[in-house]
A protein has these predicted regions:
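Short, small-residue-enriched loops and turns at beta-alpha junctions
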Residues: 70-75, 100-102, 127, 148-150, ...
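Glycine-rich, highly charged phosphate/nucleotide-binding loops
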Residues: 43-57, 70-80
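Redox-cofactor binding/interface segments in oxidoreductases and associated redox assembly factors
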Residues: 65-69, 95
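Extreme N-terminal, non-catalytic leader segments
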Residues: 82-140
Length: 184
């Protein structure tokens, strides 16, 4: 379980679209999105309070979320100092990038030294069985599309919100990185 509340790391995102992970979390879970941290040159802004890492720690933030989806899904060299500083301040870090936090030697060592968690949401520790086609109880609404960034998750979260407002039992089941971070 990813510890809450979150500080959304936007790094040096070149535009608002690059911060789509952070934007999704802020839009759908504003209660756990305490603030944002941006590096010089960042062109994205979620409209949240800008924090330093120290301010965020004092405000009770538990996890720094990499809120950027960049080309190639890599950790920019300009981000590493901030991410290492976060680990030294005992923040957990969560990321949905293709490059894994746990594959970065420096992050892994600092997390171990400071007893922090690294959450690579692209990797699961759960072994999911292959579907068998047998009828199951309950009802499901599958949201599918032909491309990314077309609104599948936002639509599904809006359906969940409306059903819950009508006191209909509903749970959002994430399949992508942003959805997993929204779900926690």
């Amino acid at each position: 379980m990813i510890n809450k509340p979150y500080l959304l790391f936007l790094g040096d995102a070149p535009d608002q679209l690059a911060a789509k992970v952070g934007q999704g979390i802020k839009d759908w879970r504003p209660d756990i999105s305490l603030g944002q941290i941006r590096l010089p040159g960042c062109k994205a802004d979620l409209g949240l309070r800008d924090y330093t890492l120290e301010e965020a720690k004092n405000a009770g933030v538990k996890t720094l979320i990499v809120g950027v989806a960049n080309r190639g899904g890599t950790f920019s060299s300009t981000w590493k100092e901030t991410l290492c500083q976060a680990l030294n301040l005992k923040f957990d870090i969560a990321s949905g990038l293709h490059n894994l936090l746990s594959d970065e030697k420096e992050f892994k060592e600092l997390a171990s030294l400071n007893q922090c968690n690294l959450f690579d949401v692209r990797v699961t520790s759960t072994n999911f069985p292959i579907a068998n086609g047998k009828k199951r109880s309950g009802k499901r609404c599958l949201t599918i599309g032909t491309d990314c960034s077309v609104g599948k998750m936002y639509s599904t979260l809006a359906i969940e919100r409306e059903m819950l407002s009508r006191e209909i039992k509903a749970t959002f089941r994430a399949t992508g990185q942003t959805g997993i971070l929204i779900s926690g």
